[in-house]
Structures are given as structure tokens and as C-alpha cells.
Swiss-Prot record:
Binding site residues for heme b b566: H97, H196
This protein's UniProt keywords: Electron transport, Heme, Iron, Membrane, Metal-binding, Mitochondrion, Mitochondrion inner membrane, Respiratory chain, Transmembrane, Transmembrane helix, Transport, Ubiquinone
Organismal lineage: Eukaryota, Metazoa, Chordata, Craniata, Vertebrata
CDD domains in the cross-refs: cytochrome_b_C, Cytochrome_b_N
GO terms of molecular function: metal ion binding; ubiquinol-cytochrome-c reductase activity
Protein name, UniProt field: Cytochrome b
Cofactor field: heme b
One Gene Ontology term, aspect cellular component: respiratory chain complex III
Residues at which a ubiquinone binds: H201
Oligomeric form and interacting partners: The cytochrome bc1 complex contains 11 subunits: 3 respiratory subunits (MT-CYB, CYC1 and UQCRFS1), 2 core proteins (UQCRC1 and UQCRC2) and 6 low-molecular weight proteins (UQCRH/QCR6, UQCRB/QCR7, UQCRQ/QCR8, UQCR10/QCR9, UQCR11/QCR10 and a cleavage product of UQCRFS1). This cytochrome bc1 complex then forms a dimer.
Principal location class: mitochondrion
Annotated membrane topology: Multi-pass membrane protein
Length: 379
């Protein structure tokens, strides 16, 4: 058996990635989120596949088909709610995973980090298009507002929007193509995950101390496989509690009203996991400026490795940077709250301040903190 595991071309890849992989002996629960994301992706693809068997991507029947899934299909309701709330769990794990990378300086593994950013964009695009599919009020108006942002692109903006819509408004063509993209992108994400892991295994994992762990490695199996299984069970427990007891907790009541192009909802907002970016978008009065800020809110992650000034890798022994990191977390929570509020005083001012603070912490204060900490340690 050992020979097959180590000799067979396919089994060897799996063995070197999940069984005999040398892993640092001190990685904490913050390193669990990678495997949890894999569980989320598998769960989303599986539940999504079963939903696609019963869903119709036509404006006249899309809303009814989702209702049909919930009412008439055997266990359709549980599949639908696992898929909807699974997306929320996915983003919780994603943000924790990125946060871990920021805190412990995992962004120094440049290739892995950059593929991770592309993955983040892919999954955000997938989630946005998935939100359009039930064809409720918030689906329709969310699609209209977000796709309309592309009209801010100089010269080609209007043509670009109409090209994406497949017409002069969000309609049947838009829904059909969004369904097609929503179906294919998770598989693109799966391929990117493989590349992500490929680059990670080239260098080996980071660890909480930030120093090389080459002198102290342990096999991934059984030490971290058992830890990952525990994490996955906890994830599924939380997901199922959400699905069984409060499936609509994170959704929008407006999406239970069929899409109506003649009636605009009083407050158009995306799902909770996009609210921080939506708040940054809204905090700039200029359309093009808002769109650029929206893109930069995620793209800023790409320049983080270039702005690393500290001689230490992680923030474990850097109190000033730690303070700034948790200030950033609080700022993102504030932005998430603001994104769900109406555009009126005092929310506009709070959103603008929080947006400025977000970019200031990441691009200015954190590099300065690194320099100060080096100086304090006489480095």
C-alpha cells in the first residue's frame, strides 16, 4: 500500500500534498481556513449542481423555479439554503484567511499571495452573479446598479455596459449569461486553487513566529488532517444551525418580491460580505472615482508585500502594527455597517472617514509602524 501511495503518479501528488507534506509544528487554528475554504468550495459546487438541475435562467420563470425548488423538490429548501448561507460561510473563511495572511506576513510568499488575490476576485464575481439568479427585486436592482458602474469607464463605458447586458437594460440575455458564468467560474476557481497550492508547496507554509520552520517539521497526516476535520465539522455545524433555524438571517427581504423594473427598492444594497466595498464606493461623490476606489479596496492587497518595511515577518512581536491591524478590522466592520445604511447624514461622513482610514492604515501607517519598530529594536 505504501508503495502505491508513493509510486503511483496521481497518488504521489495527493500524498505529497496532503499526507507526507512536511508542515511547521506550530501553526495555529488560523491555518485551518485554507482547508475550510476547500470544504466551502466543494459544498458550493455540489449544492449548486443540484440547484442547476431545477433552475431555469429565463426572466419569466427564474423566480418561480427557485420557489419550485423550495416547495416541490425533495429537500430542495435545504439545498437552496445551504447554497445561499454557504456563500456567507465562504466569505467569512475568505476574510479570516486574508486577515491571517496580513497579520502573520504570509504575503511575503508573493506568488501564492497574488494567485490568492485573483481567487478572491473570481469568487467575488461568482457570488455577485449568483445573487442575480433568483431574480428578486434586490437581484435585479443590484445587477443594474453594479453593472452600471462600468459606464464610468471613459469613452467605451456605455458600450461596455450594453455589451455585458446583451441589450439596453438588465433582461433575459443578462440573466442567461450570468447563469452561465456563475456555473463555470467555481471550476475556474478550483483550477486556481490548485495553482495556489502548487506555489504554496514550492516554499512551504509560513508559521505564527515568522521564522523558518525547516528545522522543525511534522507530517501533515495525521497531525493536521485531524485538525482540519475538526474545523470542517465546526464549519458544517455553524452552517446547518444557520440553515435550520434562521436561513434568511443574512438575506434581504426584498428578494422575496419578484423583480420589477418599474419599482425601485428604497435602499439597494448587496449581500453583507460586499457591504465594506459598497461603502467605499458610495463614499466618493464622483462615479469614476468611486469605481476606482472600489477596485483599489481589494487591489491594495497586491502592493502590501512591496510596502513591508519591518525586519520581522509577522506581527506577533510588533505591538504598534498589531494595534493598526485591529484598528483596520474595526474599520472594516464600520464600513460593513455603513454599507447597509441609507445615504444620509451622519452615515455619509462616517463612511468617508472610514474609507480614508482604510487606505491610510494599509498604505501609510503600517509601513511607518514597521520602520518605527525597527528603530525601537535598534535594527
Amino acid at each position: 500500500m505504501t508503495n502505491i501511495r508513493k509510486m503511483h503518479p496521481l497518488a504521489k501528488i495527493i500524498n505529497n500534498s496532503l499526507i507526507d507534506l512536511p508542515a511547521p509544528s506550530n501553526i495555529s487554528a488560523w491555518w485551518n481556513f485554507g482547508s475550510l475554504l476547500a470544504v466551502c468550495l466543494a459544498l458550493q459546487i455540489l449544492t449548486g449542481l443540484f440547484l442547476a438541475m431545477h433552475y431555469t435562467s429565463d426572466t419569466t420563470t427564474a423566480f418561480s423555479s427557485v420557489t419550485h425548488i423550495c416547495r416541490d423538490v425533495n429537500y430542495g429548501w435545504i439545498i437552496r439554503y445551504m447554497h445561499a448561507n454557504g456563500a456567507s460561510m465562504f466569505f467569512i473563511c475568505l476574510y479570516m484567511h486574508v486577515g491571517r495572511g496580513l497579520y502573520y506576513g504570509s504575503y511575503t510568499l508573493m506568488e501564492t499571495w497574488n494567485i490568492g488575490i485573483i481567487l478572491l476576485f473570481t469568487i467575488m464575481a461568482t457570488a455577485f452573479m449568483g445573487y442575480v439568479l433568483p431574480w428578486g427585486q434586490m437581484s435585479f436592482w443590484g445587477a443594474t446598479v453594479i453593472t452600471n458602474l462600468l459606464s464610468a469607464v471613459p469613452y467605451i463605458g456605455t458600450n461596455l455596459v450594453e455589451w455585458i447586458w446583451g441589450g439596453f437594460s438588465v433582461d433575459k440575455a443578462t440573466l442567461t449569461r450570468f447563469f452561465a458564468f456563475h456555473f463555470i467560474l467555481p471550476f475556474v476557481a478550483s483550477a486556481l486553487v490548485m495553482v495556489h497550492l502548487l506555489f504554496l508547496h514550492e516554499t512551504g507554509s509560513n508559521n505564527p513566529s515568522g521564522v523558518s520552520s525547516d528545522s522543525d517539521k511534522i507530517p501533515f497526516h495525521p497531525y493536521y488532517t485531524i485538525k482540519d476535520i475538526l474545523g470542517a465539522l465546526l464549519l458544517i455545524l455553524i452552517l446547518m444551525l444557520l440553515v435550520m433555524f434562521s436561513p434568511d438571517l443574512l438575506g434581504d427581504p426584498d428578494n422575496y418580491t419578484p423583480a420589477n423594473p418599474l419599482s425601485t427598492p428604497p435602499h439597494i444594497k448587496p449581500e453583507w460580505y460586499f457591504l465594506f466595498a459598497y461603502a467605499i464606493l458610495r463614499s466618493i461623490p464622483n462615479k469614476l472615482g468611486g469605481v476606482l476606489a472600489l477596485l483599489l479596496s481589494i487591489l491594495t492587497l497586491a502592493v502590501i508585500p512591496l510596502l513591508h518595511t519591518s525586519k520581522q515577518r509577522g506581527m506577533m512581536f510588533r505591538p504598534i502594527s498589531q494595534f493598526l491591524f485591529w484598528l483596520l478590522v474595526a474599520d472594516l466592520l464600520t464600513l460593513t455597517w455603513i454599507g447597509g445604511q441609507p445615504v444620509e447624514h451622519p452615515f455619509i461622513a462616517i463612511g468617508q472617514l472610514a474609507s480614508i482610514l482604510y487606505f491610510t492604515i494599509l498604505l501609510i501607517l503600517m509601513p511607518i509602524a514597521g520602520i518605527i519598530e525597527n528603530y525601537i529594536l535598534k535594527w
